[in-house]
Regions:
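Hydrophobic/aromatic-enriched cytosolic interaction surfaces used to assemble or bind macromolecules
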Residues: 1-122
């Protein structure tokens, strides 16, 4: 992501949309260019209206603040994601992916083809 001149970090929270625009300097460091918090109001917590409310809020902020960044990092609210810690048996690294996929199939309450999932070995 840092090969871009600027990028956005977006947090779709339960009650507000938070957006930060960063510029990348020559040394690879980040500079906060602007930060916006926009309330989603009561419609932001109503499941039937949430998607349209968040989309409108995001479009409004992008236009109002004249944001041109092409890259984006998204943070989803906790009630839209879940995590699971799994203790793996000692196996060679080639089998880790198979074990993780099996564990995901057992623990994710949706078909894996319909979700975005990933893992990190700690």
């Amino acid at each position: 992501m840092l090969n871009l001149k600027s990028f956005l970090a977006v947090d779709f929270g339960a009650g507000s949309l938070k957006l930060a625009e960063f510029e990348v300097n020559e040394a690879g460091g980040l500079r906060l260019k602007q930060f916006v918090i926009k309330s989603l109001g009561s419609e932001g917590s109503q499941e039937a209206k949430r998607e349209a409310t968040v989309l409108k809020a995001l479009q409004d902020v992008l236009v109002e603040k004249d944001i041109k960044a092409k890259g984006i990092n998204v943070c989803a609210p906790g009630f839209h994601v879940f995590s699971k810690f799994v203790k793996l048996p000692p196996v060679d690294s080639g089998k880790v992916t198979q074990i993780i996929q099996y564990e995901a199939q057992q623990n994710v309450p949706f078909p894996l083809e319909e979700v975005v999932w990933d893992y990190q070995i700690l």
